[in-house]
Swiss-Prot record:
This is Regulatory protein RecX. NCBIfam families: PRK00117.3-3. It is found in: Cytoplasm. Signal peptide: none annotated. Belongs to the RecX family. The gene is recX. Modulates RecA activity. Keywords: Cytoplasm. InterPro entries: RecX_HTH_1st, RecX_HTH_2nd, RecX_HTH_3rd, Regulatory_RecX, WH-like_DNA-bd_sf. The keyword Transmembrane does not apply. It comes from the Bacteria. GO terms for biological process: regulation of DNA repair. GO terms for cellular component: cytoplasm.
Length: 150
């Protein structure tokens, strides 16, 4: 095996990388484009590198951290992931986004007693920043209003 392949294996033992990230890392280490492509092909052929596995793990981690589909989608696009792959994996979670947004809201604002108009706007902006769309946010606040009697 080549030095580029060995270097790729060392990187992949630490964490998952997208194909683009792995290529960039190997190029930073000074390997030629041809060596990088060969190492990437070999890693994919042997199942050591998989964009599908990377996307599934990345989405699971980011959901657990309280991020929504819009932010996750943008981050994955920046990592060079195919938009169709992103959409197919995010689509598996489509029924859960309200629960994820509610969990993010509760983590940040559960102890809050102030439900003034400006405070609710601040909380909605927080969820928007986290990557949840307006439909999900409106459902969250309907749930919050019924639960907390706003």
């Amino acid at each position: 095996m080549t030095k580029a392949f060995d270097s790729a294996l060392r990187l992949l033992t630490r964490r998952e990388y997208s194909a683009m990230e792995l290529c960039d890392k190997l190029k930073q280490k000074g390997f030629s484009t041809n060596d990088v492509q060969n190492a990437l092909y070999e890693c994919q052929r042997l199942g050591y590198q998989s964009d599908v596995r990377f996307v599934e793990n990345y989405i699971r981690v980011r959901i657990h951290q309280g991020y929504g589909p819009l932010k996750i989608r943008q981050e994955l696009k920046n990592k060079g992931i195919d938009p169709d792959l992103i959409q197919s994996v995010l689509h598996q979670e489509k029924d859960n986004w309200v629960n994820y947004a509610l969990r993010a809201w509760e983590k940040k604002f559960k102890r809050q007693d102030d439900f003034s108009y400006s405070e609710i706007q601040k909380q909605q902006r927080f969820l928007l920043y986290r990557g949840f769309d307006r439909d999900v946010i409106s459902k969250v606040f309907k749930e919050v209003k019924s639960s907390y009697l706003i």
